Amino acid sequence: MTSQQIPVRLDALPPFSPVVARLLEELNGEVQSFRRLSLRLSEDPALAAQVLRMANSALYGRRGEVSSLLVAVNLIGIDRLRALVLTYGVRQMFRPVARLPLARRIWRHSLATAILAADFAMDAGGDAMEDYTAGLLHDIGRLVFLVCAPE
């Protein structure tokens, strides 16, 4: 890859989907309405399914099945929803290289780092979401390079 090709390949990186971008904007500000968040989530069926899957996980110990995004958002909470949306958005951006073994290793490492960073932050009284985000994105340059120069 030549130095002239780098900007062209960087421009070819897929951006966050508009739904993910709007959700992150809302989640990083002062959330006005869980109803609006749930309506926004419904615009991306795959993301909505992940939210419902999380709400129905054993972590929340509900007896009945959660089938409403509004109930799921209330149950999960803003911080976990933000982490889920960010993780989903980053993963979608790097879908073009997702099948490469190196990309899978980088992704697993980044996700593990994010989870551990959040766990350490909670133990130390820090900001778990901020540390989760830092852990998730700490190696993003490696994924960008892999997308730009898969050879």
Q: What kind of feature is each model-predicted range?
A:
Residues 1-151:
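Conserved alpha-helical "signature site"
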